[in-house]
């Protein structure tokens, strides 16, 4: 079993519809509206997360292991910012509602 297979098995990840692997480990709802959630999300090989816009909740992405992950964010002002997440650099990025990434 290789390292990726071990991670998938140990974290009990399932294929994500947008690509990659994931598992929700926490989620709560109040009055039918999602307030917060936490997921594990892993991209490997040629997988990617397609550009999408956040509605309602902030997302915080953390880098735990592997090669650099570039996250391109289009802010509310239309400005493009690229975050380079890696073990030796920026290890998290906060993306707020209304932003595309």
Regions of interest found by a model, annotated:
Residues 99-101:
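Surface-exposed interaction patches
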Residues 1-93:
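Non-catalytic, conserved peripheral segments adjacent to functional cores
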């Amino acid at each position: 079993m290789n390292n990726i297979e071990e991670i998938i098995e140990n974290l009990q990840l399932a294929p994500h519809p947008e690509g990659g692997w994931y598992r929700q480990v926490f989620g709560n709802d109040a009055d039918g509206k999602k307030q917060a959630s936490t997921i594990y999300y892993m991209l490997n090989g040629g997988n990617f997360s397609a550009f999408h816009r956040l509605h309602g909740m902030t997302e915080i992405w953390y880098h735990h292991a592997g090669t650099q992950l570039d996250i391109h964010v289009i802010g509310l002002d239309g400005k493009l910012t690229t975050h380079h997440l890696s073990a030796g650099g920026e290890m998290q990025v906060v993306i707020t509602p209304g932003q595309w990434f």
